[in-house]
């Protein structure tokens, strides 16, 4: 079996083994955020920060229904100067804490990748 066949077989296994209940819970949370006009924050560390940006792009662009309110999503990891300022001046352990104190409200949704 070649590389592509192994990759596709592995991908099929991962998709088949996904918890349908977990995926449904994420979708339900995002739908509720949209219905209640809540903010969705997406964060990740390292390569997952790029995934957070990509997810935010998909949520903001691919969910548009003409004439309907849009989903409000932001990848906090896209603001590198803010994160590194807090990391340098306070602690990299609490990198997201202070920005969330400024931005997050009760009922908002946090997606951590």
Residue ranges with predicted function:
Residues 18-36:
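A short, well-structured juxtamembrane/interface segment
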Residues 104-113:
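C-terminal binding/interaction regions
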């Amino acid at each position: 079996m070649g590389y592509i066949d192994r990759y596709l077989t592995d991908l099929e296994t991962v998709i088949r083994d996904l918890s349908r209940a977990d995926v449904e819970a994420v979708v339900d949370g995002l739908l509720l955020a949209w219905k209640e006009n809540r903010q969705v924050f997406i964060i990740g560390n390292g390569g997952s920060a790029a995934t957070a940006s990509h997810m935010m792009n998909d949520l903001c662009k691919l969910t548009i229904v003409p004439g309907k309110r849009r989903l409000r999503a932001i990848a906090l990891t896209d603001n590198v100067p803010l994160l590194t300022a807090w990391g340098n001046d306070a602690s990299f352990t609490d990198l997201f804490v202070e920005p969330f104190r400024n931005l997050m409200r009760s009922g908002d949704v946090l997606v951590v990748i």
